[in-house]
Amino acid sequence: MMGLGNGRRSMKSPPLILAALVACVIVLGFNYWIASSRSVELQTRIVELEGRVRRAAAERGAVELKKNEFQGELQKQREQLDRIQSSHSFQLENVNKLHQDEKAVLVNNITTGEKLIRDLQDQLKALQRSYSSLQQDIFQFQKNQTSLEKKFSYDLNQCISQMTEVKEQCDERIEEVIRKRNEAPGSRDLAETNNQHQQALKPQPKLQEEVPSEEQMPQEKGDVPRNKSQIPAPNSESLGLKPQVQNEETNEIQAVGEEHQQASIQGQAVADGTRVGAEKLDQHTQLPAGLLARPEEDSQYPEREQLVIRDRQEQQRASEEGGGQKNPGDEYDMDENEAESEREKQAALAGNDRNINVLNADAQKRGIINVPVGSERQSHILNQVGIHIPQQA
């Protein structure tokens, strides 16, 4: 019941509920108005924010494009930088390698140069030592040369004096032989001319057979002794001469003595016979090569050449003196004189042939040169050696 009583009480207060409800509606409307105004503001703000977001997105897209462009350029620059770095590193390696090679070459050159300098210094020292030894040798050689020159001059003076003595002895022997031959009777001269005529008619043997050897000459001609024993042997070291030179000199002296003997035998020949002999001498004369081809060798022995020339001049004078004597056959009649003149011509021809053979024997020792007959050179050389050739008519 009580409950029913409370219900009745609530039914009795509706204006309060309505007022409360109106107040709630007013409050809710105000709240709605406020919320709607706020929502409108929020919507405007959302629209603004959306616009901002769209602008930001557009700006972001542009920024991203620029970023992409910048990234592409950056990538290109990085690639270019990498290429530059790689080329730089390659060039740097090449330059370093080249520098290393040059350094090695320079070091090698320096080592070889130092070695060469050391070798040259050693060679310089060796050359200095050899130079000092050569100076000592030169000094010793000069001393030896002065002593040898003194010795040579002394030996040369001795040799010259000995040669003059030998020449005087030879001249005395030759004069003795000529005097003996001139004092011989005319019959002996006539017999000798006949023997020479018979020898001239025989065929002429070889040159080596006509020239007597050194052993046969003193035996056949006893008036001219061997001069080899009279010549003392000079010092071969100081003069620098071989023993063959002494043998040649003795052979020449012996040949000159034999020529003087033959000249004394042929001294009584007529002038016609001498002309015939001169003609044959012009045809067959051969001169020694020492007079033409070897003047230097002859200039080393001037005393020997002068001795031979003087002996030949004396032979020429002796032959002229012998030719000036009268022939005992001139006292005969004309027929006998003609026969004797023929014999004397042949004898003179044989004597001239022997003289030519003697000259050829002398020429064989030095070498023979054929000179044209009648040339000026032939006459000049024959005059030097003391041979007088009369001119033909």
UniProtKB/Swiss-Prot annotation:
Bilayer topology annotation: Single-pass type II membrane protein
Intervals, Cytoplasmic compartment: 1-12
Coiled-coil region(s): 40-183
Lumenal topological segments: 36-393
Chain intervals for the UniProt region annotation (Disordered): 180-247, 284-352
One BP annotation, GO: nucleus organization
Record keyword Membrane present: yes
Sequence positions bearing Phosphoserine: S187
Complexes and interactors: Interacts with DYM.
Protein name, as recorded: Golgi membrane protein 1
Lineage: Eukaryota, Metazoa, Chordata, Craniata, Vertebrata
Gene name per UniProt: Golm1
